[in-house]
From Swiss-Prot:
Cytoplasm keyword on record: no
Similarity comment: family membership: Belongs to the universal ribosomal protein uL23 family.
Record's protein name: Large ribosomal subunit protein uL23cz/uL23cy
Gene Ontology CC: chloroplast; ribonucleoprotein complex; ribosome
Subcellular location: Plastid, Chloroplast
Amino acid sequence: MDGIKYAVFTDKSIRLLGKNQYTFNVESGSTRTEIKHWVELFFGVKVKAMNSHRLPGKGRRMGPILGHTMHYRRMIITLQPGYSIPPLRKKRT
């Protein structure tokens, strides 16, 4: 998949799994419609809503040279009721 980098598993994203919301880091240049198309095509689900925000890159220093890592986008995707993405479902222990 060109637009989606990987799924995110933070405290918030794990909590959102109970609300049928999944969190992904995506390419910065990808549009919402592209990501929606990729998720529906690849996982075989129907997307109800999408929220996105851009996270800033971190500063990096190598000696006197100051640089930074690339910024990236994070999408929170809400699926319609009755759909889920099985490999990303949180296991109950």
